[in-house]
Amino acid sequence: MKTIEALENDILLQIPYLQKIKLQKLLSEKNQRKTIFCGSGDSLAAALLAEAFSNFRVRAADPLDLLKNKSMIKNNDVYLISISGNTISNVKVAKHAKRVTAITLNDKSKLAKACSKCIHLDYPSSGVFTSGSIGFISSALTCISLVSKFKIRGIMELFKRALLESKKIKIGKKIFIIGNLHTFPVAMYSAAKFYEILGTDAYYERIEQFLHMGLFSAKSGDTVIIFEEKNFHNSRIIKNLKKLGLNVYQPNPGTRNKIAQVIFFTLFSQLTPLFYAKKNHQKECYFVTAKKLRNASSDMIY
């Protein structure tokens, strides 16, 4: 099975999975204040979601930042997120921590063995190594459930809406994906999907920071995708960006529920590059064909 087909299968597997996902017991507010979630790539986005949904009681961190400040590792409860469980920086953090829990698909991994506890992510997949989809939504919702109570409803409706919205996007030479509090981490994840699946020049930023910085690298014909519900401020942004010749999209989740919005924007982030890959008769994800880049990455992170 080629990686684009595997990705599509994994995306579809999320629908039944999310209807029966097993969530974690909520940490007390006291314990949350001494908790750090740590990860890299998609897993850092999951950690940032936990931080946002906890109202910043917990902190999200990059593993190398923690290794440069080992007192943070020793004085807090650390949750290390890694689907493979073999990323070397996370394993190093685990070895310095007193109270450390792995959140991983691979409960036999180096990370799981280095941690005192393990939350095993149990989800179905195509069995082919492809761009992360169901693994991200599983780890993200697992992390959020440790800091906030929620229920998941209307998955099929969210999927249909995300599928519809994904086909409206016109991709320019450069893509800017912007969001705020609960959606900025998904913007990060979304940019990663455009990198991994299409090899697209994509950027993620908080909405306010984009207006201060990223906007000045935008050119007419570039694409801006706003991950936030409609409001007066965003309407003004859209009006001004369109005057610059930018393609501006604001996918509509159709709900004000924050968890539902995260799921919607996650699905949208998977379906949009998948749609373009299939449209261009692409069989493999970009990260598979870009062997030199993949080898350089793997050489450093494993």
What does each model-found stretch correspond to?
Residues A192, I238, L274:
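Short glycine-/small-residue-rich flexible loop motifs, especially phosphate/cofactor-binding loops
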Residues I4-E5, L246-Y302:
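Phosphate-moiety recognition in structured ligand-binding domains
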Residues L27, N31-M156, K160-S166, N180, ...:
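Glycine-rich phosphate-binding loops that contact phosphosugars or nucleotide phosphates
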Residues I4, A45-L49, Y189, T266:
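Conserved phosphate/anionic-ligand binding catalytic regions in large, soluble enzymes, centered on
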Residues K2-T3, L7-R33, D122-T223, F232, ...:
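Active-site phosphate/pyrophosphate-binding segments
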